[in-house]
């Protein structure tokens, strides 16, 4: 007989609370703590960001990865059959974060148009992470075409990731009671099609990182005081750990290391359910440690006047004033010429 997950109705109608109730309690406490810290950070950043609304939007879009992942993990524990929907929601925000990072770098430089103008003709290296090992690649001049190409790589990964996740969600809905169980595993899309899709996803992720890295390294001198690398690494390490730690839990569950009653699981519940609860609790623990570290890097000093963005704006204003003065000085000479 195939092992199936209990529905939320089954859990409510049961005479006893679910055996993973300690996981739910711990996850709830940590999630509430993260949400409280998120509200505090929102109020603090909002106070200093009145003149930088786009920068504030991008910053908080990135920071929401930690509380949102924790909240979705908690929902997956409370409502087991909603795990796939919660996971899709979390991964959707995660892939959108690439766009937030791109836009954040551009706002530091005064916007997209200012970035293109500032970096036009700058020396840049093609061998940037993750292609940094290819030292034989030559240096080239930054161009608008390269900027558009880097943008395209980031948008392509985002769109493909959302489309693939949505497709899995649709197929899961169609599978209804037949999914999930141990024989089918944790993915609805299986076989060669699954291998092709997820391999392509990894390749697109690789190039999305390359596109973001290409823009950053070209403007590295202007962004050196922004801690962009630290901001990106704390986010990316967190999301990569979340993705790859599931392999560890699956191995532990299927070798019965986590499977007896002393860990709070009865044999009537599926191994897949045990994996998900352990994984969800681990996400909550990791988020509560990673979120304060991220807040340390995304401090309110970014909003203080005198940053790169302000300097670019002031430079543009000065340039326009000079042009206006030159035009004004030339107008009387033109009138005298006409009279003569």
Regions found by a protein language model. Name each.
Residues 211, 216-330, 340:
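C-terminal transmembrane module of eukaryotic multi-pass membrane proteins
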Residues 1-23, 133-149, 179-197, 260-280:
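Juxtamembrane membrane-interface segments at transmembrane-helix boundaries in membrane proteins
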Residues 1-2, 115-138, 303-340:
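Non-transmembrane, juxtamembrane loop and terminal tail segments
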Residues 82-92, 194, 226-232, 270:
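Non-cytosolic membrane-interface motifs at loop->transmembrane helix junctions
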Residues 38-50, 82-85, 101-125, 251-259, ...:
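Juxtamembrane interfacial secondary-structure elements that flank transmembrane helices
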Residues 3-95, 99:
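Membrane-proximal first intracellular loop
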Residues 17, 23-34, 57-73, 153-165, ...:
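Alpha-helical transmembrane segments of multi-pass membrane proteins
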């Amino acid at each position: 007989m195939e092992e199936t997950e209990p529905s939320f109705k089954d859990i409510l109608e049961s005479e006893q609370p679910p055996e993973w109730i300690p996981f739910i309690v711990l996850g709830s406490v940590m999630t509430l703590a993260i949400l409280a810290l998120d509200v505090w950070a929102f109020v603090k950043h909002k106070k200093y960001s009145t003149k930088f609304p786009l920068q504030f939007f991008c910053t908080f879009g990135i920071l929401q990865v930690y509380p949102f992942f924790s909240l979705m993990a908690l929902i997956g524990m409370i409502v087991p059959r909603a795990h796939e929907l919660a996971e899709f929601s979390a991964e959707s925000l995660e892939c959108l974060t690439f766009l937030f990072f791109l836009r954040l770098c551009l706002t530091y430089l005064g916007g997209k148009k200012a970035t293109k103008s500032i970096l036009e003709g700058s020396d840049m290296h093609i061998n940037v992470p993750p292609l940094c090992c290819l030292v034989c690649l030559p240096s080239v001049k930054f161009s608008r075409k390269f900027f558009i190409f880097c943008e395209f790589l980031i948008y392509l990964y985002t769109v493909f990731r959302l489309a693939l996740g949505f497709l899995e969600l649709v197929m899961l809905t169609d599978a209804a009671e037949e999914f999930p169980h141990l024989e089918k595993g944790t993915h609805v899309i299986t076989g060669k099609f699954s291998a092709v899709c997820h391999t392509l996803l990894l390749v697109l992720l690789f190039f999305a990182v390359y596109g973001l890295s290409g823009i950053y390294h070209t403007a590295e001198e202007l962004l050196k005081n922004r801690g962009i690398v630290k901001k990106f690494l704390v986010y990316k390490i967190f999301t990569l750990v979340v993705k790859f730690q599931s392999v560890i839990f699956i191995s532990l569950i299927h070798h019965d290391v986590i499977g007896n009653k002393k860990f709070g699981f009865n044999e009537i519940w599926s191994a897949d359910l045990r994996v998900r609860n352990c994984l969800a609790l681990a996400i909550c623990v990791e988020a509560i440690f990673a979120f304060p570290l991220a807040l340390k890097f995304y401090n309110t000093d970014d909003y203080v006047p005198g940053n790169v963005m302000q300097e670019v704006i002031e430079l543009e204003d000065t340039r326009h004033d000079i042009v206006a003065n030159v035009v004004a000085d030339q107008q009387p000479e033109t009138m005298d010429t006409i009279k003569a």
